[in-house]
């Protein structure tokens, strides 16, 4: 009797034998517009890979070699592996003149595939894990973390949620998963070397492929970059965000208070008011720093025909944003990224927008100088953020700031930091009165819907929200906590 493992492999092999009869880029991408897409998508994917000059690269699911030759141009050596013999033969006929490529016909899941542990600098795959069962993905993650050197990288790109290509298929055994499945499997993966040192995978990045957002309004093409690190390496802040402040249940709880799609003060109402101040024009490019679950980004893209790039350090936030994007057909791309280390070319954006996020950033002057570089001449920045009074904080307020890891400034000092970064026409408004009105309205709504809230979440969640909002109202009433609106131009 066939095992589930053998059945899965046979189904996938037969599917790819059928789609490899015509060894073209259209067949590999399963899309009639593949040639045009490939021109944008391939350079984008290659640009996202960590540096691999002179390094050893293992390409899993190499197919006809769409990426193999490009990888060989910079790598020290490339092992190009695929389980369809005709595909790897085509790859070799196209790229065989590169003497640093070893071509292998093998199934990545096969126990017969022997790759030495700790021998690879970069593992690269493009559309591979979606053709493996859940259990095979887990086993594959364990093999990959073993094969890669400490400090080395794993890059993979998958179709999530639903298919992207328009090719007709008699059957489709592809596993279109939620992105959080891959994130969880690779985050939980650990290994020990022969000396007993423990290693895990640290997420370096996770984002949608922009070419698919631009050409198909489709956010389901997602790539991940992981680095093999010692277990003791510090990932505390991202872990704090995802396991404490912004764990999945907490995000849904915040959303109930702020309104569908929103996790910052005033939800849709304040978003509509502040976005109106940015004078958005069709075709402009907006960067949303701390985009949360994407409500403001969808609003901007749908109502002003702009292209929005939303970044957030919280994996959970971006996972929700990607799920909410399904079916909206809007020009928004999302990425798990740290705004203090992320790089964009100078003059990339028309507008930079950030809502109640920069309070987490300790070196605001450096961030604002970076924003200034990223903005095009004539560009604009709009920020709302938690602030404080210019007086010395009380011990209680100082403890709150310390416990949250916030960096708070008074409204005028905050505006001055924008001026010092090079911005002109800086508006720095104390919007604390508006903040108080919004807090009261949000608190009233939660208290009114107490039974429903407790039923959907828990009594502890209800008490946390009511306690948290009441404490914010006390801190604003004492004059210690403020809320600022900042708008500035790059001339």
UniProtKB/Swiss-Prot annotation:
Disulfide-bond pairs as recorded: none
InterPro entries: Methyltranfer_dom, Methyltransf_25, Phosphoethanolamine_N-MeTrfase, SAM-dependent_MTases_sf
Modified residues (N-acetylalanine): 2
Gene Ontology biological-process annotations: methylation; phosphatidylcholine biosynthetic process
Tissues expressing this chain: Highly expressed in roots.
Enzyme Commission designation: 2.1.1.103
Localization per Swiss-Prot or TrEMBL: Cytoplasm
UniProt keyword annotation of Transferase present: yes
Keyword Lipid biosynthesis set for record: yes
Binding-site list for phosphocholine: 159, 164-165, 169, 176, 254, 386, 400, 404, 406, 472
GO CC terms of this entry: cytoplasm
Binding site for S-adenosyl-L-homocysteine: 61, 66, 82, 107-108, 126, 263-264, 290, 312, 338-339, 355, 357
Disruption phenotype: No visible phenotype under normal growth conditions. The triple mutant nmt1, nmt2 and nmt3 is seedling lethal.
Induction / repression: Induced by phosphate starvation.
One Pfam match: Methyltransf_31
GO molecular-function term, one example from the UniProt record: phosphoethanolamine N-methyltransferase activity
Chain residues that bind N-methylethanolamine phosphate: 245-246, 254, 386, 400, 404-406, 472
Alphabetized Gene3D superfamilies for the sequence: Vaccinia Virus protein VP39
Pathway(s) annotated for this protein in UniProt: Phospholipid metabolism; phosphatidylcholine biosynthesis; phosphocholine from phosphoethanolamine: step 1/1
Signal peptide interval: none
Major subcellular location class: cytoplasm
Keywords linked to the UniProt accession: Acetylation, Cytoplasm, Lipid biosynthesis, Lipid metabolism, Methyltransferase, Phospholipid biosynthesis, Phospholipid metabolism, Repeat, S-adenosyl-L-methionine, Transferase
Family, similarity comment: Belongs to the class I-like SAM-binding methyltransferase superfamily. PEAMT family.
Protein name: Phosphoethanolamine N-methyltransferase 2
Organism field: Arabidopsis thaliana (Mouse-ear cress)
Recorded name of the encoding gene: NMT2
């Amino acid at each position: 009797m066939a095992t589930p493992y053998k059945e899965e492999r046979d189904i996938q092999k037969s599917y790819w034998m059928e789609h490899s009869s015509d060894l073209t880029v259209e067949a590999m991408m399963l899309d009639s517009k593949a040639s045009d897409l490939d021109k944008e998508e391939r350079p984008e994917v290659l640009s996202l890979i960590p540096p691999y000059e002179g390094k050893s690269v293992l390409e899993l699911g190499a197919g006809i070699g769409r990426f193999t030759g490009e990888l060989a141009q910079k790598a020290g050596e490339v092992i190009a592996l695929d389980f369809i013999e005709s595909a790897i033969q085509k790859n070799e006929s196209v790229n065989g003149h590169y003497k640093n490529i070893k071509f292998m016909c093998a199934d990545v899941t096969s126990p017969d595939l022997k790759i030495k542990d700790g021998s690879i600098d970069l593992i690269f795959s493009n559309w591979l894990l979606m053709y493996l069962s859940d259990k095979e993905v887990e086993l594959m993650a364990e093999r990959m973390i073993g094969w890669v050197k400490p400090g080395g990288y794993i890059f993979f790109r998958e179709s999530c949620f639903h298919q992207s290509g328009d090719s007709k298929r008699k059957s489709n055994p592809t596993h279109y998963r939620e992105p959080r499945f891959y994130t969880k499997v690779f985050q939980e993966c650990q290994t020990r070397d022969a000396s007993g040192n423990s290693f895990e995978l640290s997420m370096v990045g996770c984002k949608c492929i922009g070419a698919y957002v631009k050409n198909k309004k489709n956010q389901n093409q997602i790539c991940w970059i992981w680095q093999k690190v010692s277990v003791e390496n510090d990932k505390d802040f991202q872990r704090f965000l995802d396991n404490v402040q912004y764990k999945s249940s907490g995000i849904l709880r915040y959303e109930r208070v702020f309104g569908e799609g929103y996790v910052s003060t005033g939800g849709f109402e304040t978003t509509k008011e502040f976005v109106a101040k940015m004078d958005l024009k069709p075709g402009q490019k907006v960067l949303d720093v701390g985009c949360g679950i994407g409500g403001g980004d969808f609003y901007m893209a749908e109502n002003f025909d702009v292209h929005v790039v939303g970044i957030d350090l919280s994996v959970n936030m971006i996972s929700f944003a990607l799920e909410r994007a399904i079916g909206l057909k809007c020009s928004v791309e999302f990425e798990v990224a740290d705004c203090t280390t992320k790089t964009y070319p100078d003059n990339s954006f028309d507008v930079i927008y950030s809502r109640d996020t920069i309070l987490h950033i300790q070196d605001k002057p450096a961030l604002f100088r970076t924003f200034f570089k990223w903005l095009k001449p004539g560009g604009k920045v709009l920020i709302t953020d938690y602030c404080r009074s210019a007086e010395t904080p009380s011990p209680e307020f100082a403890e709150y700031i310390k416990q949250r890891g916030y960096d708070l400034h008074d409204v005028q000092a905050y505006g001055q930091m924008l001026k010092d970064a090079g911005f002109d026409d800086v508006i720095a408004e104390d919007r604390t009165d508006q903040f108080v009105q919004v807090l009261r309205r949000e608190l009233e709504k939660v208290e009114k819907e107490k039974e429903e809230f407790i039923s959907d979440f828990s009594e502890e969640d209800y008490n946390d929200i009511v306690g948290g909002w009441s404490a914010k109202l006390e801190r604003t009433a004492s004059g210690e906590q403020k809320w600022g609106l900042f708008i500035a131009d790059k001339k």
